Amino acid sequence: MVQQESRLKVADNTGAKEVLAIRVLGGTKKRYASVGDKIVVSVKEATPNGSIKKGAVSTAVVVRTRKEVRRPDGSYIRFDDNACVLLGPQGEMRGTRVFGPVARELRDKQFMKIVSLAPEVL
């Protein structure tokens, strides 16, 4: 569960390491983002030679949350951190690699590129 002012790890190779959630996209009353939801983020920590610089504003999709996500079969999935993947202006991935596991819910939300690049889909 991610909300405004939440800090997330970045799970791709764009050069950003940590971002701050500015806004949850998807309506005026949407307060929390879960796995597969889009958010607007500001880069708070970045590597010196990365393509994304500190202070840059971008959209991102949440790929892991510490808050458990309920599946249709009644099971739950939970991760050790909150993480996202940065997106470009047309909704495509900005990076070329994805680090760490991602949730299967991304497949249902049509983020096939992220699912195919992830080392593990849980």
UniProtKB/Swiss-Prot annotation:
The keyword Chloroplast does not apply. GO terms for cellular component: cytosolic large ribosomal subunit. One of its GO terms (biological process) is translation. It comes from the Bacteria. One of its GO terms (molecular function) is structural constituent of ribosome. Keywords: Ribonucleoprotein, Ribosomal protein, RNA-binding, rRNA-binding. SUPFAM superfamilies: Ribosomal protein L14 (SSF50193). CDD domains: Ribosomal_uL14. Pfam families: Ribosomal_L14. PROSITE patterns: RIBOSOMAL_L14. Part of the 50S ribosomal subunit. Forms a cluster with proteins L3 and L19. In the 70S ribosome, L14 and L19 interact and together make contacts with the 16S rRNA in bridges B5 and B8. Belongs to the universal ribosomal protein uL14 family. Binds to 23S rRNA. Forms part of two intersubunit bridges in the 70S ribosome. This is Large ribosomal subunit protein uL14. The lineage of its organism: Bacteria, Pseudomonadati, Bacteroidota, Flavobacteriia, Flavobacteriales.
